[in-house]
């Protein structure tokens, strides 16, 4: 049997009955939304609903939370925080994801997001870029709505959003 997949017979779930309220000392620094996202990712990818995730489920759950992890890192996390059976329970997952989320650099994350919009690598988000992202996200926004979004945040009035304008929009209020 490979250590990458769950065995047929599983240990009982190690979650307390009130696991939705279980927190670590660091998780108090997370927003309710962030804690909810961690719980939702775990529950979504714990496909057999036994309170434990294997290698593949851990990798996909971490990716869903915005962490693109390599095989070696996932294996290390399972070895250090999982059980002898190679499975990880919710409390360990919550602890790891809390640390990772709190260690994020918001400006770095926003620069990566900007690059997703700027797929033609012009250094600016154009109406065309915004239209593509809206379509990929399944948003049905009209041309006028998309243009209004650009106009509202286009500080230098060049018809596009550059990185500085994007950061100003996204970091407003922090």
From Swiss-Prot:
Chain positions recorded as Ca(2+) 2 binding sites: 154, 156, 158, 160, 165
Domain annotation EF-hand: ranges: 33-68, 105-140, 141-174
Gene3D superfamilies, sorted: EF-hand
GO molecular function annotation: calcium ion binding
PROSITE patterns (UniProt xref): EF_HAND_1, EF_HAND_2
Annotated positions binding Ca(2+) 1: 46, 48, 50, 57
Region (Disordered): 1-33
Listed SMART domains: EFh (SM00054)
InterPro entries: CALM/Myosin/TropC-like, EF-hand-dom_pair, EF_Hand_1_Ca_BS, EF_hand_dom
GO cellular component, one term: myosin II complex
Keywords, sorted A to Z: Calcium, Metal-binding, Repeat
Database matches in CDD domains: EFh (cd00051)
Amino acid composition bias (Basic residues), ranges on this chain: 1-11
Reported phenotype of the disruption mutant: Resistance to the estrogen receptor-modulating drug toremifene.
Biased segments, Polar residues type: 15-29
Note: The breast cancer drug toremifene modulates the ability of CML1 to activate calcineurin (CNA1).
Function: Calmodulin-like protein which plays a role in the activation of calcineurin (CNA1).
PANTHER family, alphabetized: CENTRIN 3, MYOSIN LIGHT CHAIN 1, 3
Protein name (record): Calmodulin-like protein 1
Lineage: Eukaryota, Fungi, Dikarya, Basidiomycota, Agaricomycotina
Gene: CML1
């Amino acid at each position: 049997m490979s250590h990458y997949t769950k065995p047929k017979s599983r240990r009982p779930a190690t979650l307390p009955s009130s696991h939705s309220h279980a927190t670590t000392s660091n998780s108090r620094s997370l927003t309710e939304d962030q804690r909810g996202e961690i719980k939702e990712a775990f529950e979504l990818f714990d496909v057999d609903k036994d309170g434990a995730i294997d290698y593949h489920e851990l990798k996909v759950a971490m990716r869903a939370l915005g962490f693109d992890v390599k095989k070696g890192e996932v294996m290390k996390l399972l070895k250090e925080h999982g059980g002898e059976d190679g499975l990880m329970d919710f409390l360990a997952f919550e602890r790891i994801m809390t640390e990772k989320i709190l260690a994020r650099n918001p400006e770095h994350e926003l620069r990566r997001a900007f690059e997703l919009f700027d797929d033609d690598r012009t250094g600016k988000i154009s109406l065309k870029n915004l239209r593509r992202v809206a379509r990929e996200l399944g948003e049905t926004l009209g041309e006028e709505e998309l243009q209004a979004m650009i106009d509202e945040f286009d500080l230098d009035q060049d018809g596009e959003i550059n990185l500085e304008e994007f950061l100003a929009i996204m970091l407003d209020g922090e």
